[in-house]
């Protein structure tokens, strides 16, 4: 069973979806670059996405590592993703915020900034692959993995705020670069601990920077161009050829550049509007299909539950469904990778645990809601294309085109859905590029220092690669950056294990504050950070 090892696409989807320059000078450049990176990407990918045998079925060890961490933290923190859900929603609404709290953006803006980096093509294409390879039962295991990932996200994002750096200009920097450097040195006093912390932080910065340029940038630009080209007639349409791809790439670069120049405040303002918009567009499409087939919903849920524990018709049976579901969810919500704390650390708060609580909503939105809606839509539609794809994979191991599977489900009710899908892909891609531009900028600053010149140099490089990604595919480069990002999970989770007691103390400190008269009488604030009009006291 091939692992699903692209954050925003499955193995085999890159050739099916991303079509760079096919001939001429650009095609030659692409071939040469891919030839250089291919052996590196293959070797690193074989290690990072290597499989261990589970009842005779291959299970990517990096997925097992991520899922195990989620399970351990769930027990250690007493199922905080369940017990703390109501409090997380209160914090998100600004219930425990003050206007003068240190930071740059509100809890809501931090959440939408991070969600925009995780919700992407994986929720459209990746889920289509998962339910084709793992059957409807893979949906159940996706949800379970998402619930476990909520706790990992709580831990890493609390640490992101706890160890963030405050700069003289009022900005902050947080994430694995900070909590690995400071936290490891704190937990392991002495020169060895300080050295280890610096090395781990530098490695984290390099890994985040590389993926930010690859999967978080070039791949998104490429998919946007391909989707726009397909919906306008493909090779016979007005946007066929490298020239149109170049123009679209420049337009994307201008849009992203305009947003990221404003920093995290600008990113927060944009994502706080863009993320709800793209969620509404996509979820509405799912709901329309579900409502048109409302009588089939009980049977669909029955198929999901029975498939989870019987694995009927799935290669590998129950274990096969479990592996595919866990893999898709782990690679979709990024819980434990260390990327999301960069966005969450910019929040305005005096209590790091507040943002950890808000952050645990992220895997819930990404996996439990969006991925489940996609899977339910596919299962309910039960298209011939999906059934043929399942049979073809079971018989021949044929690569699955996840976008086609998902799109076919929508087309049963909405023949014009490719247009909606194009809008969703563009929104997902732009929001992902914006967020990963910020992640990469923080990694760049950690490696090369903070200055206006350095910042502008990075932004120029990032936007240039948007244009390059729109025209060229560089499949091997993207595979390499994917492997690098998930390698970060190895060192990040080691850091989370070491620093889990710090998170427990921060949670206790916040809960103690909640019992104080000052906190109980706190004037509620809305998502914008300002007091809600209905709650203002005379």
Residue ranges and their predicted role:
Residues 156-164, 168, 286-303, 316-317, ...:
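Extracellular/periplasmic helix-exit of transmembrane alpha-helices
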Residues 73-74, 115-116, 145-172, 181-222, ...:
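Helix-loop-helix module between adjacent transmembrane segments
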């Amino acid at each position: 069973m091939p692992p699903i090892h692209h954050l925003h696409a499955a193995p085999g989807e890159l050739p099916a979806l991303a079509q760079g320059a096919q001939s001429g000078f650009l095609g030659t450049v692409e071939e040469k670059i891919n030839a250089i990176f291919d052996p590196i990407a293959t070797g690193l990918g074989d290690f990072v996405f290597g499989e261990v045998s589970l009842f005779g079925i291959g299970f990517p060890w990096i997925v097992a590592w991520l899922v195990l961490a989620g399970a351990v933290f769930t027990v250690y923190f007493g199922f905080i993703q369940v017990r703390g859900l109501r409090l997380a929603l209160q914090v998100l609404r600004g219930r425990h915020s003050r206007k003068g709290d240190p930071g740059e953006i509100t809890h809501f803006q931090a959440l939408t900034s991070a969600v925009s980096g995780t919700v992407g093509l994986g929720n459209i294409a990746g889920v289509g692959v998962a339910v084709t390879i793992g059957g409807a039962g893979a949906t159940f295991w996706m949800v379970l993995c998402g619930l476990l990932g909520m706790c990992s996200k709580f831990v890493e994002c609390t640490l992101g705020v706890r160890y963030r750096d405050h700069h003289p200009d009022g900005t902050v920097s947080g994430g694995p670069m900070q909590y690995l450097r400071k936290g490891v040195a704190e937990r392991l006093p002495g020169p060895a601990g300080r050295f280890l912390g610096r090395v781990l932080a530098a490695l984290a910065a390099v890994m985040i920077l590389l993926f930010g340029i690859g999967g978080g940038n070039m791949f998104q630009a490429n998919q946007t161009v391909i989707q726009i080209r397909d919906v306008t007639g493909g090779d016979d349409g007005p946007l066929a050829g490298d020239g149109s791809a170049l123009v679209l790439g420049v337009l994307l670069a201008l849009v992203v550049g305009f947003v990221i120049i404003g920093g995290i405040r600008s990113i927060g303002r944009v994502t706080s509007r863009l993320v709800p918009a793209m969620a509404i567009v996509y979820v509405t499409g799912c709901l329309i299909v579900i409502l048109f087939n409302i009588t089939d919903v009980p049977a669909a849920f029955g198929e999901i539950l029975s498939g989870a524990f019987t694995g009927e018709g799935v290669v590998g049976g129950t274990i096969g469904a479990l592996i595919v579901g866990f893999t898709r969810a782990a690679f979709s919500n990024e819980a434990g990778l260390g990327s999301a704390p960069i966005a969450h650390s910019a929040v305005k708060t005096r209590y790091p645990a507040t943002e950890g609580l808000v952050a645990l909503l992220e895997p819930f939105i990404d996996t439990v809601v969006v991925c489940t809606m996609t899977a339910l839509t596919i299962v309910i539609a039960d298209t011939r294309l999906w059934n043929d794809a399942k049979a073809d994979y079971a018989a021949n191991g044929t690569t699955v085109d996840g976008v086609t599977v998902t799109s076919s489900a929508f087309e049963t009710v909405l023949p014009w859905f490719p247009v909606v899908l194009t809008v969703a892909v563009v929104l997902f891609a732009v929001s992902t590029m914006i967020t990963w531009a910020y992640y990469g900028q923080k990694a760049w600053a950690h490696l090369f220092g903070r200055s206006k010149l350095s910042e502008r140099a990075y932004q120029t490089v990032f936007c240039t690669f948007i244009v390059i990604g729109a025209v060229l595919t560089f499949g091997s480069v993207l595979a390499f950056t994917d492997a690098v990002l998930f390698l970060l999970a190895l060192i990040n989770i080691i850091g989370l294990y070491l620093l889990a007691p710090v998170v427990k103390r921060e949670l206790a400190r916040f809960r103690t504050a909640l019992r104080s008269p000052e906190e109980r009488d706190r004037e509620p604030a809305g998502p914008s950070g300002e007091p809600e009009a209905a709650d203002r006291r005379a």
